[in-house]
From Swiss-Prot:
Annotated spans, Disordered: 183-203
SUPFAM superfamilies: beta-beta-alpha zinc fingers (SSF57667)
SMART domains with a match to the protein in the record: ZnF_C2H2
NAD keyword on record: no
Gene designation: sdz-12
Zinc finger motifs (C2H2-type), residue ranges: 27-48, 63-85, 91-113, 120-144, 153-176, 271-293
Reported function: Together with ehn-3, may play a role in gonadogenesis.
Protein name in UniProt: Zinc finger protein sdz-12
Any one GO biological process: regulation of transcription by RNA polymerase II
């Protein structure tokens, strides 16, 4: 054997030995014998239920998909997966009409819709708490009603049990609240505008009663009281204020021309709040609204001094908080 041939053989042996050493260092799952590029991907793979330490017996009982060769630990999971191969998306979102293969995919999608809303009711029986943000009602269920993600949560309307507060909230607001809205008759034009009673008596209390959608509209009774801030505002704007004795009746009736115009036409607004851009067709309503803004801090409540931050939080605070309107400006 020539010297050059001997060198070629030794080089081949060294290369083969190096390849054997490199292959021995390749990360490999000891359960399913699958190889990975690095230890990080191997650790991620080992978290899978079929390849966790101590679960090697599961490998011998895998259920394999005939379409894509994926394997599952039980038959229900295999059937759930096979729905994606059927090509039929039978689950439809009632909000955006998007379709899905499986119920769990639809539930995750509805949860995203739910978090975009700005009004949430507590789904617990005999609890009337309402929230502006999704995080508020979810924390309320966990902290106040002591629901957890490891125990079933019951629906206050149909008493069904759900695996988490999130699933309960999706069920309650889409299955019950949406069904209630769709079954309710469309309100007439006169029902959309609740009767408004405006009183200029010296009562120290102003009451705002906003009827929920499930109930017929109620009267919105507002007393101006004897607040120094309102009196000062009235004096400064006396030239633009209507004569309440002649032009403002105690109760607006749908038969009155001014009320009928609100229904049949779109009049040009005369008064607008410079802070929250709410427009009014009546100077008295504009006065009452402007008196709620604290001087120098537009989103601070002039009644109780609460700092609200923006116009949405400010509006919800005025509607839901218990206030003594007679103390405005004092």
């Amino acid at each position: 054997m020539s010297l050059s041939s001997l060198d070629a053989v030794l080089s081949l042996i060294a290369t083969s030995s190096t390849l054997d050493q490199d292959s021995a260092k390749v990360p490999q799952c000891q359960v399913c014998k699958r190889k990975f590029a690095n230890q990080k991907t191997l650790r991620t793979h080992m978290k899978h239920i079929t390849c966790r330490p101590g679960r090697s017996n599961v490998v011998n009982h895998k259920f394999r998909c005939e379409n894509c060769e994926k394997q599952f630990t039980n038959k229900p999971n295999l059937k759930r997966h096979q729905i994606t191969h059927s090509g039929s998306k039978s689950k439809k979102c009632s909000t955006c009409q998007r379709t899905f293969f499986r119920e769990d995919q639809l539930q995750r999608h509805l949860h995203n819709h739910l978090k975009e809303r700005s009004h949430f009711d507590c789904p617990v029986l005999n609890c009337s708490m309402q929230f502006v943000f999704y995080e508020g009602v979810e924390n309320h269920l966990v902290n106040h009603h002591h629901f957890s993600y490891s125990e079933s949560a019951p629906c206050g309307k149909c008493h069904k049990l759900f695996g988490s507060p999130r699933h309960l909230l999706v069920h309650y607001h889409f299955d019950h609240k949406e069904a209630l809205r769709s079954s309710a008759p469309a309100p007439t034009s006169s029902a959309r505008l609740s009767p408004i009673t405006v009183s200029t008596s010296g009562s120290p209390r102003a009451q705002l009663a906003i009827s929920p959608q499930e109930k017929p509209p109620q009267k919105l009774s507002i007393n101006l009281g004897t607040s120094p801030m309102i009196e000062e505002f009235c004096e400064q704007n006396s030239a633009t204020l209507p004569n309440t004795d002649q032009q403002l009746s105690p109760t607006l009736s749908p038969n009155e021309p001014r009320f009928r115009n609100l229904i049949t036409s779109e009049p040009t607004p005369s008064f607008e709040c410079k802070h929250c851009t709410i427009k009014f067709h009546d100077a008295t309503m504009s006065i009452m609204h402007n008196a709620l803004h604290a001087p120098g801090s537009p989103f601070k409540c002039a009644i109780c001094g609460a700092e609200c931050g923006n116009k949405i939080v400010f509006t919800m605070h005025i509607i839901t908080a218990s206030h003594d309107f007679g103390g405005i400006g004092t």
